Amino acid sequence: MPYLFTSESVSEGHPDKVADQISDALIDHFLAFDPNAKVACETLVTTGQVVLAGEVKSKAYLDVQEIAREVIRKIGYTKSEYMFEANSCGIFSAIHEQSADINQGVDRKKKEEQGAGDQGMMFGYATNETNDYMPLALDLAHKLLIELAALRREGKQIKYLRPDAKSQVTLEYDDNNRPVRIDAIVLSTQHDDFDTEEKMHKKIEKDIVSILIPRIVSKYPKYKKFFDGKTKIKYHINPTGKFVIGGPHGDTGLTGRKIIVDTYGGKGAHGGGAFSGKDPSKVDRSAAYATRHIAKNLVAAGLCDEVLVQVSYAIGVAKPMGIYVNTYGTAKVKKNDGEIAKIVEKLFDMRPYAIEQRLQLRNPIYSETAAYGHMGRKPETVTKSFKSNDGKIIKKKVELFTWEKLDYVDKVRKAFGIK
C-alpha cells in the first residue's frame, strides 16, 4: 500500500545552524594551524550574544571572537534590525584545556592503536533513489534552501529575504518503496516587514511558487518529473503568517541540535552523537562519515538498493565492538546480511586512526559540512585561507566530502564477485 514519508531541512541562517557553523569554523582553524589538535567546541547563539565553550588540546592560539564574527557575517546577519549582528554581538569564550583523563584514552605510542574518543554507535545509510545515493525527500528539502539562500544573496528577484528558513518535503512511495510524487512542500522563510501581513503572505507565497520552484526544476533536471503538473503539490508557505523576527533573536541556537537534518532525514538510523564542533578523533563524527562511505560504495557497486551500516566503539579501544549491515532485503548477492558484514569488516579498516587517514580527516574541511547536510555532497578540492592570531595567513589545499567518493566500488565488486 502506498505511504507518505517526510524529511526537513533548515537554512544556514537557522539559529542551530549558525551555532554549528561557528563550532566547525573553530575546528577548521585549529586543524589548519595544528593538524593534531583535539577539539570539542559548543556554541550558543541568542539575541545579541554568542557563547563559546569546550575543550581543546592544541599548539595553536586563535582569535575565536573574530572567527565567530566572520561566520556570522558570511551567513548574512549584518543588519542591526536582526537583533543579532556580526560586528556588534557580544562573544563570550569559555574554551579551556581538554581533560588529561580523556586524552590518555585516545593517544597511543603507535598512531594505529589510537583509541576511540568515546563509546557509542554510529550509522551510515545509502539508497539508490537519487544520483547521490541519498533519500529524495531530504535531498529536495536541502536544495530548496540552498537555492533560497542563493536568491537572498543575489538580491534581485526576491529582495525581502532574511537568513532564517526551514523546509519540509512529503513524498508518496509506492508498494515497491520507490518515490512516485511530491505530496506537500512546507517552506517558512524569514523576511523584511514590507507591507501588511496579508499582502506580505500573498507576495511570499507567489514568489516561492513562481521563482524558487522553477529555479529548482531548471538547476536540477533530475527532479523535473516531480514538478510536471500531473499531480497537485500542496504548498504551505509561511503557514503561520508573518515571520520577521527570526534567527538567534527569535530562537536560541545550539550546536548539534539538527542531527537528522545533518544525516538522512529520518531514513536509516542515528546513534545520537552530533558532528559539528568535534575533531576527527571523536568517532561520533569520523565513524559516521566512514559508515556513510561504506554504505554509498556498497549501493553504488550494485550489492543492494538500500543499506544501513552500524559500527560501535568502546572509549580508548581502537578496534570496533562490532559492524552490522542491513540491506532491507535488497541484496543482489547470495549472502545474508551477517555474511556481508563480515566481508565489509575485512574490506574497511574501522579503527579511528585508519578512518582519519583513509578519509583525510585531519584537514580543515568541516565548515562546508555545517549547513545543508554532511552527507550526499559533492567531493571537491579547494584552497582555503586561514588567519592566525598574529595576522599570519596560510593557505591549505584540501579535499572536501571525501566520504562521498566512490573509490571502493571496484574493491566491493571484487570482494563480492559482482560483475
Curated annotation (Swiss-Prot):
GO terms for molecular function: ATP binding; magnesium ion binding; methionine adenosyltransferase activity. Residues 98-108 are annotated as: Flexible loop. ATP binds at residues 14, 164-166, 242-243, 251, 257-258, 274, 278. Pathway: Amino-acid biosynthesis; S-adenosyl-L-methionine biosynthesis; S-adenosyl-L-methionine from L-methionine: step 1/1. Mg(2+) binds at residue 16. InterPro entries: ADOMET_SYNTHASE_CS, S-AdoMet_synt_C, S-AdoMet_synt_central, S-AdoMet_synt_N, S-AdoMet_synthetase, S-AdoMet_synthetase_sfam. It catalyses: L-methionine + ATP + H2O = S-adenosyl-L-methionine + phosphate + diphosphate. K(+) binds at residue 42. It is found in: Cytoplasm. Its cofactor is Mg(2+); K(+). Binds 2 divalent ions per subunit. Binds 1 potassium ion per subunit. Its main location: cytoplasm. GO terms for cellular component: cytoplasm. Keywords: ATP-binding, Cytoplasm, Magnesium, Metal-binding, Nucleotide-binding, One-carbon metabolism, Potassium, Transferase. Gene3D superfamilies: 3.30.300.10. L-methionine binds at residues 55, 98, 251, 282. Catalyzes the formation of S-adenosylmethionine (AdoMet) from methionine and ATP. The overall synthetic reaction is composed of two sequential steps, AdoMet formation and the subsequent tripolyphosphate hydrolysis which occurs prior to release of AdoMet from the enzyme. This is S-adenosylmethionine synthase. It comes from Cytophaga hutchinsonii (strain ATCC 33406 / DSM 1761 / CIP 103989 / NBRC 15051 / NCIMB 9469 / D465). The gene is metK.
